[in-house]
Amino acid sequence: MKELLNDFFLILQLLTRIPVNRNLLCRRENFRRGASFMPLVGVIVGGIQWIIYKLCIIIFSLNVSIVIVILAGIVLTGALHVDGLGDMCDGFFSFKEKGKIIEIMKDSRIGTYACLAIIIDILLKYSFFCSIVPSFSLIIIIAPVMSRFSIVFIAFIGKPAKSTGSGNLFVENIGKWQLFWAAFITVITLFFLMNMNFIYVIILIFAGLFMSFLFNVFCNRKAGGLTGDLLGANNEIVEILTMVMLCVIITK
């Protein structure tokens, strides 16, 4: 139990800015086991955002409340995944060779494509939240749960693009059991949040995993594999896709 708590808090500390303030073991196996808890981190992040929405909507309009919810998500994660999306777009749309693409993604300076990607990402989230949240506010929790599970999946099927880096803590380090427990947490969580509609749960999970599979193929061609930035980019892409799927399901 002590090891499980260590691994959970390690992943929570890595993926969020929530102050854990614990001396944690940070060995490679801790990150491997901790990957199982990524969907649970999504529950925590999304849950906090959902509570913020419920409080804000009492005082503010829908538009203002959604802006605050999105801002809260960025603050909670330290813009970790959004930054990965921006770095990916700067690298991939430079149309350079693989080595140069990885070098561009490591550059701390932000480029035009990164700016555009981040703006579009936030606008899409804002638009889908405004469309769906009034009738189904639990999308605020469902989207980050599904997107964190997709990180586990793509890290399981992918290969590292470089010999060192934060992405290597998970890529080719996650085993079948970690994928199984992450899937179990995701399915159970979505099952209850989706009013026990198993068909909708399967649709969301299949869509997210299929997108991650395609994104992995794309990353192999462009960068030769996955990096930490590309894991973050996959998170954002699947989060938006989940919103698209929920928009279709809820409004049909």
Swiss-Prot record:
It is a multi-pass membrane protein. It catalyses: alpha-ribazole + adenosylcob(III)inamide-GDP = adenosylcob(III)alamin + GMP + H(+); alpha-ribazole 5'-phosphate + adenosylcob(III)inamide-GDP = adenosylcob(III)alamin 5'-phosphate + GMP + H(+). Joins adenosylcobinamide-GDP and alpha-ribazole to generate adenosylcobalamin (Ado-cobalamin). Also synthesizes adenosylcobalamin 5'-phosphate from adenosylcobinamide-GDP and alpha-ribazole 5'-phosphate. The chain crosses the membrane at residues 34-54, 55-75, 113-133, 138-158, 174-194, 198-218, 230-250. It comes from Clostridium kluyveri (strain ATCC 8527 / DSM 555 / NBRC 12016 / NCIMB 10680 / K1). Pfam families: CobS. The keyword Signal does not apply. Pathway: Cofactor biosynthesis; adenosylcobalamin biosynthesis; adenosylcobalamin from cob(II)yrinate a,c-diamide: step 7/7. It is found in: Cell membrane. This is Adenosylcobinamide-GDP ribazoletransferase. Its EC number is 2.7.8.26. GO terms for cellular component: plasma membrane. Keywords: Cell membrane, Cobalamin biosynthesis, Magnesium, Membrane, Transferase, Transmembrane, Transmembrane helix. Its cofactor is Mg(2+). One of its GO terms (biological process) is cobalamin biosynthetic process. GO terms for molecular function: adenosylcobinamide-GDP ribazoletransferase activity; cobalamin 5'-phosphate synthase activity. Its main location: membrane. Belongs to the CobS family.
